[in-house]
Amino acid sequence: MTFSIMRFNPETDKKPYMQDFELDVSAIQGKMLLNALEALREKHPDIGLRRSCAEGVCGSDGMNINGKNALACVTQLKDLPDRVVVRPLPGFPIIRDLIVDMEQFYAQYKKVKPYLLNDQEAPQKERLQSPEERAKLDGLYECILCACCSSSCPSYWWNPDKFIGPAGLLWSYRFIADSRDSKEKERLDAMKDPYSVFRCRTIMDCATVCPKNLNPAKAIRKIRTEMLQETESGE
């Protein structure tokens, strides 16, 4: 197989360029794209990429594979053509090769306060939920912050410092929907500006690329609905 990888070293290169590598994938251990990239790195150790668990859990090896954002560790080689084009996640500054600067992404994640807020007196044990209340979190808590969704979103490309983005808004709704959280109104009020939520144009790329098959656009729609209901009720 041929792997065309975007290369960029800011210390030596004026701009990114593509470099082709040939690899006999039948001779490597593993059946995933990440295994092939690791095999290439053994021969070319200057290729820069992020990886950690290699099990689709940590979200660290997100990249653009033949034009679609995905995790290299769960992308099977048998599903790819003989020529594979690999680029870094779009919309982020490139640190080196396939490694991008995700500082802005995490700043938007931090903005939504991704943790339980509850000003009620803490119980002696855990805060209980009914099975029905717990079920409302399905499709929300599974996000691994790989940034495949946000980096596929044109609205996020245009306003990365103002639009929270699909991943951040998915996490926001995960706590808005949590019965153990008592700050729903404060969370909604913090996003009632023209950009935080309402820059979503329902392009749906976020749901298309999510490796966990989550739907950030659905969560964004629910946030908007709750905002409108709150406005109509005069709260």
Swiss-Prot record:
Keywords: 2Fe-2S, 3Fe-4S, 4Fe-4S, Electron transport, Iron, Iron-sulfur, Metal-binding, Oxidoreductase, Transport, Tricarboxylic acid cycle. PROSITE patterns: 4FE4S_FER_1, 4FE4S_FER_2. Belongs to the succinate dehydrogenase/fumarate reductase iron-sulfur protein family. Gene3D superfamilies: 3.10.20.30, Alpha-helical ferredoxin. [2Fe-2S] cluster binds at C53, C58, C73. Coiled coil: none annotated. Residues 133-163 form the 4Fe-4S ferredoxin-type domain. This is Succinate dehydrogenase iron-sulfur subunit. [3Fe-4S] cluster binds at C153, C200, C206. PANTHER family: SUCCINATE DEHYDROGENASE [UBIQUINONE] IRON-SULFUR SUBUNIT, MITOCHONDRIAL (PTHR11921:SF29), SUCCINATE DEHYDROGENASE IRON-SULFUR PROTEIN (PTHR11921). Its EC number is 1.3.5.1. GO terms for biological process: aerobic respiration; respiratory electron transport chain; tricarboxylic acid cycle. Pfam families: Fer2_3, Fer4_17. Its cofactor is [2Fe-2S] cluster; [3Fe-4S] cluster; [4Fe-4S] cluster. [4Fe-4S] cluster binds at C143, C146, C149, C210. GO terms for molecular function: 2 iron, 2 sulfur cluster binding; 3 iron, 4 sulfur cluster binding; 4 iron, 4 sulfur cluster binding; electron transfer activity; metal ion binding; succinate dehydrogenase (quinone) activity. It is an enzyme of class 1 (oxidoreductase). A ubiquinone binds at W158. It comes from the Bacteria. It catalyses: a quinone + succinate = fumarate + a quinol.
